[in-house]
Structure formats: C-alpha cells, structure tokens
C-alpha cells in the first residue's frame, strides 16, 4: 500500500512520531512518503491527481486534517492520529498506532463525509468540510442577510455573522454558537446565526438536496472563512451559493461510536 503521512509543521514531537510511524509501516511492507504540513500561506497540492496514494495518515489536530482535505486534488481515504487538543476528526490516539497499522492488510471500512461546495456570484471558490463562516471585518458590527432556499426567500435577518456547517462541523464553531450536534450520517446544511438581533432567528437544518444562497444586504466590510483556513473578502450585495459537493471527504471508519466519541471528547474540553 502507498501511504502518505502528513504531519503538523514545526512540532518536534509530531516529527519524531511520524518517523516512528514510517519505520513501522515499512516493517509491514508499505511504501511511504512524508509531507510536512505548513498551515500558513499557499502550498502546492499534496500529491498528483493522476497518482494519488492509497491512504493518507494525518498526524495533528483538526486544523491539520481540514487543511489536508483542502489540499488534496482528489479525495482519498484519511485517518487522523490525534496530536491536537481535542481532535474530533482524529479517530486514533498515538498509543493506538501499532494496532491500527497491524490491521492495514484487512479491508478498511470507509465513511463518506459530506462537504459544502461554495460559489460567490456564480464563481467556484472552495469546498468546506467543517463550515463556511461569514463575518464582518470590523468587530461589533452587524451584517444583514437575505437567505434563499431553492430560489425562494426563506429568511431575512441581522446578526454579527452566519455559520453554515456540515454535520461534521456541527461539533466545531457551530456548536460553540449554540447549534445542535448532528450525526455525520445526516446530510444537510446547518445554518447558525452569530448573535442575531432577534431571538427568533434560530439555527436551521436544511436538507442537502436543496440549494442555499446568502446575499449580503449591508454595506459593512465582510469576509468568508472556509474551514478556518481560507479568507475571502466579500463585497456589498455579494451572493454566496452553497450546495452539496459531489466529492465527499473519505475517512477510515475506526469503529468508534460517534456519540460515545463526542461524549468522551467533550469531557476533556
């Protein structure tokens, strides 16, 4: 099996662990390469779309995993080894490495995680695994949002910002903003206003077969943030269109119960 190891850049403990993992994989007959992930600035794709690896092992936290999915020209199976603070996306702890590697000769069950395809005024600008965030450039300023679902006006409100999350991202920023935890097998858009002016503006869960468009009606400077990694300036009257991406992220299913894992992770926050 050809395996790409992606580790968090500049962390000596992570780098040492990645070399130990590489030696273990070689011992089991796998071919490996290591990519040191720099979380800052632009970077080339992790690999050629014509010759992708069979598996990507990410050593780090959720941020490293999110950036890895963005920098893959095609989606291949991912497994995360948690070297972050919480690691909702990482199913394996460092001490479980040997057991996982010993099972790589067996068929690996996959879990497809829905992603959001994003366009601004009709132009594709990115894909989100966790969430897309719309906020002002200046603190303590509100934006005015007009929401269309399948071309019909659904809501108009003012808020400090708006989170549009996948079920995977429901345990991230959306949860901190008061959104519900959503089973990742449920495919939908979770729309969570940030500090809305009216208390009646509550989170919505929208079926992924629908198309959602968000128009900024205010004149305040704003930006779109994708998975906490990419920032894009938004002009007044910009329309952000969201739809289900045809290319989901693929994760190795390590056999953990989702709700048990969430309960365990939240206890450590």
Swiss-Prot record:
ATP-binding listed as a keyword: yes
Keyword set includes Lipid biosynthesis: no
Protein name: NAD kinase
InterPro entries: ATP-NAD_kinase_N, ATP-NAD_kinase_PpnK-typ_C, NAD/diacylglycerol_kinase_sf, NADK
GO cellular component: cytoplasm
Residues reported in the UniProt entry to bind NAD(+): 62-63, 130-131, 141, 158, 160, 171-176, 195, 229
EC number: 2.7.1.23
Top-level taxon: Archaea
Record's subcellular location: Cytoplasm
Organism from which the protein derives: Methanospirillum hungatei JF-1 (strain ATCC 27890 / DSM 864 / NBRC 100397 / JF-1)
Primary location class: cytoplasm
Enzyme class: transferase
Lineage, broadest ranks: Archaea, Methanobacteriati, Methanobacteriota, Stenosarchaea group, Methanomicrobia
Catalytic activity: NAD(+) + ATP = ADP + NADP(+) + H(+)
Active site: 62 (proton acceptor)
UniProt function note: Involved in the regulation of the intracellular balance of NAD and NADP, and is a key enzyme in the biosynthesis of NADP. Catalyzes specifically the phosphorylation on 2'-hydroxyl of the adenosine moiety of NAD to yield NADP.
Alphabetic keyword roster: ATP-binding, Cytoplasm, Kinase, NAD, NADP, Nucleotide-binding, Transferase
Molecular function per GO: ATP binding; metal ion binding; NAD+ kinase activity
GO annotation, biological process: NAD metabolic process; NADP biosynthetic process
Coiled-coil residue spans: none
Family: Belongs to the NAD kinase family.
Pfam families given in the database record: NAD_kinase (PF01513), NAD_kinase_C (PF20143)
